[in-house]
């Protein structure tokens, strides 16, 4: 089985985070951010992406969860970029639609080296557990910009905010899994420019 492992450590005045990922894993996870709902979502991303993730974050949660969530996105983005290496043979694009009961979400990504994000969410509550729902977009932005990917995430419809966000994180994992999949027919990288 192919492995693509990356370790990243980041310490600031607000957070301290260490991460180890294997892009071609089995979906094993050991994630501790101090934010229960966020841990649950990251576990889902790892499991459905078949990405092994070990991550421990200590943040200034006495302030709020913003710094921790955003900085976890930064560290995971850096980890993905490092684990991808030269990107030879990867399919580059991934799209997933995931239903969660009454909710439906989609995530499309392009491992292009050109970070960009578009989110279309209409959450109807401010918080789930200790996590502000607006931080879903902050996490995705930090992830995309530090991984060097274009990411479009959308909740097409839904009523239960937990279900909507859960569908987004599952779709993120599945889209990543598709994009990093190796196709032996690809000579070099999937670009006419010869670089990603």
Curated annotation (Swiss-Prot):
EC annotation?
Answer: 4.2.1.19
Q: Write out the GO biological process terms.
A: L-histidine biosynthetic process
Stored Pfam families: IGPD (PF00475)
Q: Which InterPro entries match?
A: IGPD_sf, ImidazoleglycerolP_deHydtase, ImidazoleglycerP_deHydtase_CS, Ribosomal_Su5_D2-typ_SF
Which keywords does this Swiss-Prot/TrEMBL entry list?
A: Amino-acid biosynthesis, Cytoplasm, Histidine biosynthesis, Lyase
Which is one Gene Ontology cellular component term of this protein? cytoplasm
Q: Give the family from UniProt.
A: Belongs to the imidazoleglycerol-phosphate dehydratase family.
Name assigned to this protein = Imidazoleglycerol-phosphate dehydratase
């Amino acid at each position: 089985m192919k492995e693509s492992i990356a370790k990243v450590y980041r310490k600031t005045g607000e957070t301290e985070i260490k991460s180890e990922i294997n892009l071609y894993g089995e979906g094993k996870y050991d994630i501790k951010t101090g934010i229960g709902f966020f841990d649950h979502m990251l576990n889902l991303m790892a499991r459905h992406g078949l990405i092994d993730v070990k991550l421990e974050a200590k943040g200034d949660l006495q302030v709020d969860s913003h710094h921790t969530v955003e900085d976890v996105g930064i560290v995971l983005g850096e980890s993905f970029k490092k684990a991808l290496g030269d990107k030879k043979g990867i399919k580059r694009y991934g799209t997933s639609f995931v239903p969660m009961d009454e909710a439906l979400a989609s995530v499309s990504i392009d491992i292009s080296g050109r970070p960009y994000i578009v989110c279309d969410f209409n959450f109807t509550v401010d918080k789930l557990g200790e996590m502000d729902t607006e931080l879903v977009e902050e996490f995705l932005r930090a992830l995309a910009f530090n991984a060097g990917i274009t990411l479009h995430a959308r909740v097409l419809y839904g009523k239960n905010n937990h279900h909507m966000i859960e569908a987004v994180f599952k779709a993120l994992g599945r889209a990543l899994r598709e994009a990093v999949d190796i196709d032996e027919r690809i000579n070099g990288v999937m670009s006419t420019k010869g670089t990603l």
